[in-house]
């Protein structure tokens, strides 16, 4: 994001980002399991869909039956999911001093609805910042995967996964551009690496951020 955003003084907020099939769900679960084994309270969540409102948004934006949506409609639907998610799930957990791990957050909107849809990035960012109260993760882990390889892992595709290869290539570049503008905030990892090696890289980075977490 172009703005430094707002970071909480309590808890730890870690976000996993990247294209389809990059292993975000696997690595977020591994990180949760390790942190819990170290005595930390952890909330594992995801976007879109981890609230009652979000489930309805997820159904609309991902179902192939939805068909075409205007770009602005899609941006606003994802923003609605984020607003509800931050207000009812993410912020309360951070205020309790927990570690919050989310599978996707604002960068996904910037990469998919901004770069992927070739929409005005500043407009997309402004909407997402407002929806999330400008709350930013303390660390964003970007699992970088070549789109053809990542998409090849799916037998059935949802509405977004079913977009063209060119769309997903723009999304990948959008993620990399975000990381390139703020390299200190991101941990960019080649998703082709072995699962355990990726996990070790993530653990090594997270260890240094645990000081503000209440066990």
Predicted segments with their positions:
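Pre-Walker A (Motif I) flank of P-loop NTPase domains
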Residues: 9-13
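Hydrophobic anchor at the beta1->P-loop junction of P-loop NTPases
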Residues: 16
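A glycine- and Lys/Arg-enriched "phosphate-lid" helix/loop adjacent to the NTP-binding pocket
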Residues: 104, 108-173
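Walker A (P-loop) phosphate-binding loop of P-loop NTPases
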Residues: 21
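Conserved lysine of the Walker
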Residues: 24
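NTP-dependent small-molecule kinase module
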Residues: 2-7, 32, 148-215
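Hydrophobic positions on the alpha1 helix immediately C-terminal to the Walker A/P-loop
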Residues: 27
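ATP-dependent small-molecule kinase phosphotransfer cores
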Residues: 38-132
